[in-house]
């Protein structure tokens, strides 16, 4: 994965000119103007009550409260991350950020930080209210690239992508990446009937699925709920049917497949994935439990972030292709 771009999302569009703190994060009897933030209280935001009662999320009112909202709400009220949402983000090339002013010009070693931009205050009242749609974050866009160890079929797909519907669709399952559904079927059949991979692909068919060869026609699962059955109905019988495609994607992601499709971005063509980081303000040291003001942006703070390693593929371009969407 080659990280190419980074984007700021969910930056507050309103904020108090003077900091306020309270025990609850709300404008209640405990609020103190110009008060000191502690490990147990909260900075009070202008829209604290709307964040507390969840009305920003339930009412899809993100654009009323944030610049660069993470997701887009369509005419049917569906929130998702796709091309329209990404056009809302504040996006920069990572190379430009790394060429920006150094945080410590006197530093002569490796790995110095560079200044990106100012971000307005964004605090959320309560631990459980700290959600993806409300907290300020950074999104990294990565491009899949081939290495010397990349299998031939995957290397061909990555290096010859045109960003059209004719490009191979990649499927990730259990940390393995497959090129085309035919390859998924082939490996699932090798795993055998009792395997979880077999069931994820074929469901519980009454027939015996068969892989296509030069001498044998493919036999697809007759389990009408399985991804294999629905892929055949879409891809082989009605490729232009959006409803059939959606049904297949829903079944595939429901079986924990992540779907990656090529695209033409503004400056290149390829297969892209996305990594999300939520700005951590008051780290409680427990990754499994959120603490007060853990995910927030507070004035007069400098937040530093370093990407040192990538361990897995990121989220796909579109929410409908993601078994674990934000």
Question: What residues fall within each predicted segment?
Answer:
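C-terminal or late-domain output modules
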Residues: 280-326
């Amino acid at each position: 994965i080659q990280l190419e771009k980074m984007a700021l999302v969910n930056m507050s569009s309103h904020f108090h000119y003077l900091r306020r703190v309270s025990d609850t994060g709300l404008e209640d009897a405990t609020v103190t103007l110009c008060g000191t933030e502690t490990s147990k209280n909260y900075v009070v935001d202008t829209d604290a009550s709307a964040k507390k009662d969840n009305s920003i999320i339930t009412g899809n009112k993100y654009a009323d409260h944030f610049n660069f909202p993470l997701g887009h709400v369509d005419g049917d009220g569906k929130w998702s991350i796709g091309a329209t949402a990404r056009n809302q983000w504040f996006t920069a090339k990572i190379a430009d950020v790394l060429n920006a002013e150094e945080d410590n010009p006197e530093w002569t070693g490796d790995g110095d930080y560079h200044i990106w931009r100012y971000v307005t205050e964004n605090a959320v009242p309560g631990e459980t209210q700290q959600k993806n749609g409300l907290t300020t974050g950074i999104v990294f866009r990565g491009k899949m690239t081939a290495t010397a160890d990349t299998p031939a079929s995957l290397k061909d797909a990555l290096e010859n992508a045109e960003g059209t519907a004719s490009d191979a669709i990649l499927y990730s399952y259990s940390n393995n990446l497959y090129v085309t559904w035919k390859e998924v079927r082939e490996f699932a059949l090798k795993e055998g009937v009792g395997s979880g991979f077999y069931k994820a692909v074929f469901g519980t068919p009454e027939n015996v699925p068969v892989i296509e060869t030069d001498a044998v026609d493919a036999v697809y699962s007759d389990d009408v709920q399985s991804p294999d059955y629905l892929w055949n109905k879409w891809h082989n019988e009605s490729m232009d049917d959006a409803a059939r495609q959606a049904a297949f994607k829903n079944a595939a992601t429901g079986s924990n497949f992540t779907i990656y499709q090529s695209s033409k971005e503004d400056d290149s063509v390829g297969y892209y994935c996305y990594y999300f980081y939520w700005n951590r303000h008051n780290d409680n040291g427990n990754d499994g439990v959120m603490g007060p003001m853990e995910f927030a942006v507070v004035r007069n703070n400098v937040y530093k972030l370093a990407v040192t390693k990538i361990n897995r593929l990121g989220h796909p371009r579109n929410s409908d292709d993601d078994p674990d969407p934000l």
